[in-house]
């Protein structure tokens, strides 16, 4: 393989990577907690897009529970976004884990 072919392959891979990054930005995953009382929507770049809180879990006397549920929902969405990114990048990275 000559240098020109290597450059073409690198450019093609760069275009594919850009496409996957755009897809990740547009793909939404959901994390939930409290049986769906809290829902966090996050894109494939792990940017929170929205948080929905059911009025039933808003108790001024138990703010700590609400905070805990939010953490669980955010972490759930983050794990799903990470898994999504790994799955989408796998064809480009040859299955090397931990790159994205």
Swiss-Prot record:
Gene3D superfamilies reported in the protein's UniProt record: Nucleoid-associated protein YbaB-like domain (3.30.1310.10)
Entry annotated with the keyword Zinc-finger: no
Cross-referenced InterPro entries: YbaB-like_sf, YbaB/EbfC
Principal place of residence: cytoplasm
GO cellular component: bacterial nucleoid; cytosol
Subcellular location, record wording: Cytoplasm, Nucleoid
Matching Pfam families: YbaB_DNA_bd
A molecular function (GO) term: DNA binding
Keywords assigned: Cytoplasm, DNA-binding
DNA-binding recorded as keyword: yes
Segments crossing the lipid bilayer: none
PANTHER family, A to Z: NUCLEOID-ASSOCIATED PROTEIN YBAB
Family, similarity comment: Belongs to the YbaB/EbfC family.
Quaternary context: Homodimer.
Role of this protein: Binds to DNA and alters its conformation. May be involved in regulation of gene expression, nucleoid organization and DNA protection.
NCBIfam families for the chain: DNA_YbaB_EbfC
Protein name, as recorded: Nucleoid-associated protein Caur_0522
């Amino acid at each position: 393989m000559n240098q020109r072919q290597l450059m073409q392959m690198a450019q093609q891979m760069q275009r594919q990577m850009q496409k996957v990054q755009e897809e990740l930005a547009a793909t939404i995953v959901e994390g939930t907690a409290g049986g769906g009382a809290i829902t966090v929507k996050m894109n494939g770049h792990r940017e929170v897009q929205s948080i929905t809180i059911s009025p039933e879990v808003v108790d001024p006397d138990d703010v700590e529970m609400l905070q805990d549920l939010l953490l669980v929902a955010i972490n759930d969405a983050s794990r799903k976004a990470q898994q999504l990114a790994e799955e989408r990048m796998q064809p480009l990275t040859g299955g090397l884990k931990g790159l994205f």
